[in-house]
Amino acid sequence: MISGDGVMMGYAFPVRVEAVYKAPDVPYVGLLKALDAVGRDQVYVTPSNRNNGGDHPAAFWGELLSTACKHKGVAGALTDGPVRDTTRMQALGFKVFGVQTSPLDINSRYEVVEHNVPAVIDGVDINPGDLIVADV
């Protein structure tokens, strides 16, 4: 667990990301649509796409997303990629599970292209609405 205390439990809200190698005309469009759609008691799931062309060490989660999701009642976030802003997320008490930290955000590195779709993290299929329980 990168931030928060105790057990994280909620219903999966997986997104799909793709690696990009230049800045889009309008960044974060897919991310913002997903952020609008995620709801109370859901877990925002972001697979790193590391086995499908994702080779950037960019953080998939940080303080701004944590703040927005905490105020929406989202249960937490789960990624098999890096996260950033860990001190600020810990201060918020928002539960985030990730594998490492990175100061880089996803702009010009990844784009969220779909949300509330099936995902795979470390060989585990995660479908929208699956119950996720995480603890350290």
Question: Could you describe each region identified by the protein language model?
Answer:
Residues 1-128:
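Feature captures the catalytic cores and cofactor-binding loops of soluble hydro-lyases/lyases
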Residues 131-136:
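A hydrophobic, small-residue-rich beta->alpha segment in the mid-to-C-terminal subdomain
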